[in-house]
UniProtKB/Swiss-Prot annotation:
Subunit structure, interactors included: Part of the 30S ribosomal subunit.
Function statement: One of the primary rRNA binding proteins, it binds directly to 16S rRNA central domain where it helps coordinate assembly of the platform of the 30S subunit.
Full protein name: Small ribosomal subunit protein uS8c
Taxonomy of the source species: Eukaryota, Viridiplantae, Chlorophyta, core chlorophytes, Chlorophyceae
Organism of derivation: Chlamydomonas reinhardtii
UniProt-recorded Gene Ontology molecular function terms: rRNA binding; structural constituent of ribosome
Amino acid sequence: MKSHGLINDSIGDMLTRIRNACLAKKSSVSIPFTRLNQNIAQILEQEGFIQTYQVSLDSQDLTIRLKYRSKKIYRGKKKESCITNLKRISKPGLRIYSNHKDILRILGGTGIVIVSTPEGLMTDREARLRGIGGELLCSVW
């Protein structure tokens, strides 16, 4: 059994691990399992930012398989992450809430904001469509 220590902000930790793994061109990244992290991974998969995710048998870890696209450059190909940026919006010390009308749009809708609503986690598009607001957890593009 691995000890992950005390993590005050599991979402911030998850985003940092994904960001660092993308910069290092890793194929996958392991994250401490929480239901919230699993729900975020599910949205990232649905929106095409990651290939897939998997929960370990002992439910201690969440493994995310990262997604890259090939970018042709002079003499060869370069792996480019499907995730350009991950940014934490609401933080443990400063929570950010919004009603459905005021949820910010990321890059004219090409990026997403993950919103924690009374009906669960969803993208900003889905929250606007359903007419519900909530806590703005993070943006991804």
